[in-house]
Amino acid sequence: MFPGRSTFFIFYDQNRPANGSSFGRAGAKRLRGQGRGQKGYLMINGVIFDMDGLMFDTERMWATFWEPALAALGLPYKKGLSEAARGTAGETLRNVVRQFYGQDCNAAAIVDSLHAVADKAFQKPVPKKPGLDELLAWLDEQHIPMAVASSSRMDVIQRNLDNWGMRHYFSVLASGQQVTRSKPDPEIFRLAAEKLGVTPGHALVLEDSYNGVRAGAAGGFVTVMVPDLLPADAEMRRLYTAECRSLFEVLDGLKAKRW
């Protein structure tokens, strides 16, 4: 427990799942293992948010940035690139680019061109995901510390938060620039948890992407998936703790302590 902080408990009842949410095998096993009988309890004292596709409707925007970024370098867009690159940053992202354009391509120049296109688009407020305001306000009222852990650059994270006046909710901002291994490696979530002063087993990670869920699960976090562009597949259902259709459902689940 931390002075000045609140804690909430998540429980799992295998006979009564939360409306609109579902449990993955890993989540159900973890919760049952910590509870009594058919119910398990998890003490959550910190929440870590992904940004693109979870807080803001920006994954669709990123998908449109690749074509002009590549065209500026005289290169064609190759099908599947944006999906493979989703949720990655740094050398991981450059390696994805090399997979599509060859090991000898100038991956750094391609990524720089991508960020140049994104910088222009992100000067104005980007669309928020439904339920974000309500979830942040409730967590703030409960004195639950929050972090953003995003593969995006720090200036992009700060700009998106500042454009909506919500940076004050977060005591920690973790950027892909601060880690050497991007998602699906859990390094960025571990960094955020360390700065929040919470352990992975007591930190809730909210993610929309496959790589993000992989990272949360690999790091031992309580990982809730809120799918954006891609629905949860069999792998995700094995990895995540639970799935919700929106941030409103995340909030409902926390209030009801159903998961």
Predicted regions and their residues:
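Aromatic (phenylalanine/tyrosine) cluster motif
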Residues: 2, 8-12, 23, 41
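Ala/Thr-enriched low-complexity intrinsically disordered regions
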Residues: 7, 18, 26-28
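Asp-based, Mg2+/Mn2+-dependent phosphohydrolase catalytic module
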Residues: 10, 41-45, 137-140, 154-259
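Glycine-biased, low-complexity coil/linker segments
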Residues: 24-25, 32
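Short, Lys/Arg-enriched N-terminal segments with co-localized hydrophobic residues
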Residues: 30-42
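N-terminal helical cap/lid subdomain that shapes the substrate entry/recognition surface
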Residues: 41-142
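Residue-level detector of anion-binding/catalytic polar loops
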Residues: 76, 145, 222
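Conserved phosphate-coupling serine/threonine residues in phosphotransfer and NTP-handling enzymes
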Residues: 150-152
